Structures are given as C-alpha cells and as structure tokens.
Amino acid sequence: MQVYGEEGRRKVERHRQLRKGKGFATIERTTRVDLAEPEAGATVLLECMTNLAANEMFSGEGQEDAAGGREQGPGATETVIGSRILEDVERLYAKCRNLVIVTGEVASDGISYDESTESYIRLLQRVNCSLCQQAEEAYEVVYTIPVCLKKKPEEPAVGKESL
C-alpha cells in the first residue's frame, strides 16, 4: 500500500499486527511484486490487490521506461497493466510455496465515476477474475463470514474402495 499520512501509517501497522505470528512472509512493495525475494518455501500474503492495481495504474513507481518494455501510468491501458500485474504475480508465485492474495470488490455501489476510475475498476475486475480462475481456492468475506467461491477438490483417500 502506498502510505499517505498518519492514518495510512496506522492502518499499515494495524495490518502488520494482525498478521504477526500467522506464518506469512512479509515483503512490502507498492509495485512490481515480481521483484520480491521471499525465503524458499515461504507462504506469502499479497495484501492488497486493490492497492497494487491502483499503484501500478496511477503511480508509475518502480516501472521501467519504454526501453525496458513496461508501459506505465495513466497512459497505459487497463489491459496492458492487467497483463503485467498477472505476469508479476505469476513470477512471485513461482518463488514461494503458497501465495494468498487479498483483494476487494469496488464496483458494487452503482455509482458512475470519471473515466480513469472506471478504467481502474475494469482493471481490478479483470485481474480478480483471472486470479480466481487460476486459484486453487477462492473465498469472499461478507460481513466477516468467509463464503467459499471455489475449493480445491479433495484428493481420494489411499486404500479406500469406491462405492
């Protein structure tokens, strides 16, 4: 999360305390999650895709210039940025044992926004759908209640006879 002001710092610290002792590797990056170097066999928590998508779309921070082949900032299309985010997440996943991604749903209020915000919403929807398709498991938390959207099929027990 790009931290702005005291409220942002308090929010980040609160989240750090909530994760403490849960077995997640903490790597703090506002963009380019593929550059993170978790310890071998780590379970990585990527929190939060809504912030990462906004940072990748609007800040341009940490991006290579045109010679490096990474289009950046508001001039880049949501399709280009979405593909880049998904590639970065794939490279991060290749470096760890488990990857847990927290995201948010930001378009259910029925409000019309300016074009750059609508573009961000489309970007996040595209990324979230793709991540859910690739995930072994996916949950939506509704008023603190986890609702399973997708669950990894249980493997049959060895030695059990079929019915």
Model-derived regions, located:
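Short, surface-exposed amphipathic charged segments that create phosphate/polyanion-binding patches used
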Residues: 39-46, 153-155
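Active-site flanking residues adjacent to catalytic metal/cofactor-binding acidic residues
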Residues: 27, 46-47, 103
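Short amphipathic alpha-helices and their capping/turn segments at secondary-structure boundaries
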Residues: 26-42, 84-96
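Conserved P-loop
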Residues: 1-39
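Conserved protein kinase catalytic core
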Residues: 34, 53-54, 110-111
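Conserved nucleotide-binding/hydrolysis micro-motifs of P-loop NTPases
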Residues: 2-5, 50-52, 106-108, 145-147
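A basic- and aromatic-enriched beta-loop-alpha substructure that forms the phosphate/nucleotide-
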Residues: 22, 31, 42-67
